[in-house]
């Protein structure tokens, strides 16, 4: 039955590249297109954030090439990775570029796709579940909740230079976005939280750090904007992590379904009769 389902999906052709999102960690969150590509690819160029269990779906004989990029650590240059995809495709391979999360959400998938266009290499984009949604769901934190917010902002915690992005209007986000989800923000969390507080956010606003989201190593720290930097240091947390700011963090007390599997008692009223401001 499952083979019949895969038989109806598009083929990964020789000389082409698929840019595929592997989701936030759990192999069960792979899409059918992603699993199908793993079954067909001759070469799989994968990121550091791709769960090794996902790679077990690769067909026998497939070549695995690591192209992981981690902030502050030695890693291949983006242009070199993009050109490697071109080289592999021109050699007649069926190439799978497998990226954690979604390739078009802070995954530099657009840059790689533009290089393929530049060199006239056929390609397909296969979206994945981004960690800023799926990873938070595994922590029991919804990015939207009708009583809390009508908008959410996704941002990166560092720019191409490795510094806090100076093109982000921190005051505007602080005043206008009830929920903020941040990727790659651990390194500069002190500066980022200071920017948000200076922009008008309450120092007591809840914040959650979800490290190694959707994996057996998942760890969640709940804190506040004012205590975030110190609490992260005290806990010894390391990237990768998703950071979420906003009242939705309080819902984890009721929606931590993984914790419930281990015996956590979930709260019936996670807001404990708190008066919430009108959703923005």
Swiss-Prot record:
Binding partners and assembly: Homodimer.
Keywords recorded for this protein, A-Z: Cobalamin biosynthesis, Methyltransferase, Porphyrin biosynthesis, S-adenosyl-L-methionine, Transferase
Regulation: S-adenosylhomocysteine is an extremely powerful competitive inhibitor of the uroporphyrinogen III methylation. SUMT exhibits a substrate inhibition phenomenon at uroporphyrinogen III concentrations above 2 uM; this property might play a regulatory role in cobalamin biosynthesis. The enzyme activity is completely insensitive to feedback inhibition by cobalamin and corrinoid intermediates.
Reported function: It is a step in the biosynthesis of both cobalamin (vitamin B12) and siroheme. Neither uroporphyrin III nor the chlorin (factor I) is a substrate of SUMT.
Outcome (variant: residue 130 to A): Strongly reduces S-adenosyl-L-methionine binding. Causes slow synthesis of precorrin-2
Domain of life: Bacteria
UniProt effect for mutating residue 49 to A: Reduces S-adenosyl-L-methionine binding by about 50%. Causes slow synthesis of precorrin-2 and accumulation of precorrin-1
Molecular functions per Gene Ontology: uroporphyrin-III C-methyltransferase activity
Pfam families: TP_methylase (PF00590)
pH dependence (UniProt free text): Optimum pH is 7.7.
Source organism: Sinorhizobium sp
Catalyses which reaction(s): uroporphyrinogen III + 2 S-adenosyl-L-methionine = precorrin-2 + 2 S-adenosyl-L-homocysteine + H(+); uroporphyrinogen III + S-adenosyl-L-methionine = precorrin-1 + S-adenosyl-L-homocysteine + H(+); precorrin-1 + S-adenosyl-L-methionine = precorrin-2 + S-adenosyl-L-homocysteine
Enzyme class name: transferase
Residues bound to S-adenosyl-L-homocysteine: 24, 100-102, 130-131, 184, 213, 241
Name assigned to this protein: Uroporphyrinogen-III C-methyltransferase
UniProt pathway annotation: Cofactor biosynthesis; adenosylcobalamin biosynthesis; precorrin-2 from uroporphyrinogen III: step 1/1; Porphyrin-containing compound metabolism; siroheme biosynthesis; precorrin-2 from uroporphyrinogen III: step 1/1
GO BP field: cobalamin biosynthetic process; methylation; siroheme biosynthetic process
Phenotype of gene-disrupted mutants: Cells lacking this gene are deficient in cobalamin biosynthesis.
PROSITE patterns: SUMT_1 (PS00839), SUMT_2 (PS00840)
Annotated family: Belongs to the precorrin methyltransferase family.
């Amino acid at each position: 039955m499952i083979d019949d389902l895969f038989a109806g999906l598009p083929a990964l052709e020789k000389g082409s590249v698929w840019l595929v999102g592997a989701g936030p960690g759990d192999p069960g969150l792979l899409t059918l297109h992603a699993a199908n590509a793993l079954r067909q690819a001759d070469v799989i160029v994968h990121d550091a954030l791709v769960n090794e269990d996902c790679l077990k779906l690769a067909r026998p004989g497939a070549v695995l090439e690591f192209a992981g990029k981690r902030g502050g650590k030695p890693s291949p240059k983006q242009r070199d990775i993009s050109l490697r995809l071109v080289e592999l495709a021109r050699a007649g391979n069926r190439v799978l570029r497998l990226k954690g999360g979604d390739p078009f959400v802070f995954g530099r998938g657009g840059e790689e796709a533009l290089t393929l266009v530049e060199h006239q290499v056929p390609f397909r984009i296969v979206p994945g579940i981004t960690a800023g949604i799926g990873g938070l769901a595994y922590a029991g934190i919804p990015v939207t909740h009708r009583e809390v917010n009508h908008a959410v902002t996704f941002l990166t915690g560092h720019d191409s230079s490795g510094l806090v992005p100076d093109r982000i209007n921190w005051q505007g986000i602080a005043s206008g976005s009830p929920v903020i989800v941040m990727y790659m923000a651990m390194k500069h969390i002190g500066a980022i939280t200071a920017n948000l507080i200076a922009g008008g956010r309450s120092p007591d606003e809840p914040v959650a750090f979800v490290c190694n989201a959707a994996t057996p190593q998942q760890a969640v720290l709940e804190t506040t904007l004012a205590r975030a930097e110190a609490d992260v240091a005290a806990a010894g947390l390391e990237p990768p992590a998703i950071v979420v700011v906003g009242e939705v963090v309080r819902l984890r007390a009721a929606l931590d379904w993984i914790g419930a599997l281990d015996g956590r008692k979930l709260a019936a009223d996670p807001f404990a009769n708190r008066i919430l401001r009108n959703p923005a």
